[in-house]
Amino acid sequence: MTKKGYLPSMEARKLLYATDLKEKSLSFNLLKGILPVRELDFYEIAFLQTTPYDSWIKGLSDLNIKSKIILDDQLLPHGILKAAKNEEASLIVVNFDREEGKTSRNSVIRQLIKKSSLPILFTNNTNKEIKPDGKGIFACVVFATDWSYKSEKALAFLLDFKKILGEMEIVNVIKGKLTIKEMRELKNRLAETRKICLDNKIDAESHIYAGKTSEEILTAAKDYKAAMIVIGGESEKKGLNRLFKKSSSWEVACEADLPVLVVP
């Protein structure tokens, strides 16, 4: 049974938003998509930026959200994680330019997934229109699971977000043919996970995909028009069904054209 209470038990939480985008490239639409976390007592956003601009400070202040600017001319993994620690952040948001330095960008993503003890939301600089339902990127979530320890932590994190979640599509990816017994056990596990979500007032459905894990997760996101993907971070041991490669979370975070939340 998944335990609840992944987020720190404190009245106020802080978000660290790391970006190398210039002022004209940074999407306010995307920021609006993240703002539903206000309902979870996230009261402050610390912007870790390579460029000194503060055009959003007043707008966020009008929404009763504190904000500050921290300058870092490189945005390397250790610098981002150090800033998150110094700011006592509960969640890291990373918004990197997809057009410049892809190899460097992917390397930073990989190191962050490996080393972070905090959940990281890779926004992937999406400019997709946010649904006008108040839930932003939490309106429709694809949750990829293999029931490993990391996946169960990701589910626990999502349960903490149940107040702002819309629809959840629970996805498991298999490789090769399963026996009738294995398929029955898989369906039972999916049903158990779905029940946990339903018991927490989360509208959830479950699905089985077959193929390369990262590719099928991205396919599921397209199939269900997801606004965000949630996946557990890399594990030393593979999941019970040996379905996830250690690099799946990294591949999804690098290749997706929508936000990806990786829970360590």
Region locations from a protein language model:
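Short, aromatic/basic amphipathic alpha-helical patches
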Residues: 54-63, 109, 185, 189-196
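A short, acidic, amphipathic alpha-helical segment used as a generic capping/interface helix at domain edges
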Residues: 192, 212-222
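Gly/Ser-rich helix-loop-strand patches that form or flank binding pockets
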Residues: 1-4, 79-131, 223-264
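Small/aliphatic-rich secondary-structure junction motif
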Residues: 2-59, 137-181, 195-202
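Charged docking surfaces used in two-component/phosphorelay signaling
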Residues: 52, 71-77, 209-216
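Short, well-ordered secondary-structure micro-motifs
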Residues: 104, 132-133, 154-155, 179-183, ...
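Rossmann-fold cofactor-recognition segment
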Residues: 66-69, 206
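Residue-level recognition of beta-strand->loop/alpha-helix junctions
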Residues: 46-49, 71, 124, 172, ...
